[in-house]
Structure formats: C-alpha cells, structure tokens
Amino acid sequence: MVSIRLSRGGSKKRPFYHLTVTDSRKSRDGRFIERVGFFNPVARGQEERLRVESERLNYWLSQGAQCSERVAKLIKDAAAAA
C-alpha cells in the first residue's frame, strides 16, 4: 500500500520532516517514491513552517494513497490557514 507520511531529517534537537509518498513496507527514512512537501516544527520568525505541493498530493490521494494521522492533520490545518 502506498502511504503519505513524514520522514525525519534535520539534526539533533532540531527536527525537520519531509512529506513523502512511500511504500508502507519501507522504513521511515528509507526509499521513497516522491517528496510532496515539508514540515518544520521549530520554525522561527519568517521561516516557512509547512509547504505542501497540493497538486501532487491530490494526485497521489486519487491513486489510493493513505495519509498518516499526522499528515492528515497538517493538511487540514494548512487548508484552514489558506
């Protein structure tokens, strides 16, 4: 099954996450199909906190990809803010 979930990057005590489309059997930070955005939980000042390529996200959702709970919440919050 294809899923849309967060993949962790960044450094110690300063996380950064990519929204990735991946096979659900792969590891969290392993091989992915496509990156469709990012989430920076520790963004300060003018730094961008969340970016989602909505066109690609909608494409993958139409193909049957399942969002993780956290990604679904982020998408919902981004839609409300826009």
Curated annotation (Swiss-Prot):
InterPro entries, A to Z: Ribosomal_bS16, Ribosomal_bS16_dom_sf
Keywords: Ribonucleoprotein, Ribosomal protein
Gene3D superfamilies noted in UniProt: 3.30.1320.10
Family annotation (Pfam families): Ribosomal_S16
GO CC, any one term: cytoplasm
Sample GO molecular function, one term: structural constituent of ribosome
GO process annotations (BP): translation
Entry keyword Ribonucleoprotein: yes
Domain of life: Bacteria
Family to which the UniProt record says this protein belongs: Belongs to the bacterial ribosomal protein bS16 family.
NCBIfam families found in the cross-reference section: S16
Protein name: Small ribosomal subunit protein bS16
Species of the source: Saccharophagus degradans (strain 2-40 / ATCC 43961 / DSM 17024)
Taxonomic lineage: Bacteria, Pseudomonadati, Pseudomonadota, Gammaproteobacteria, Cellvibrionales
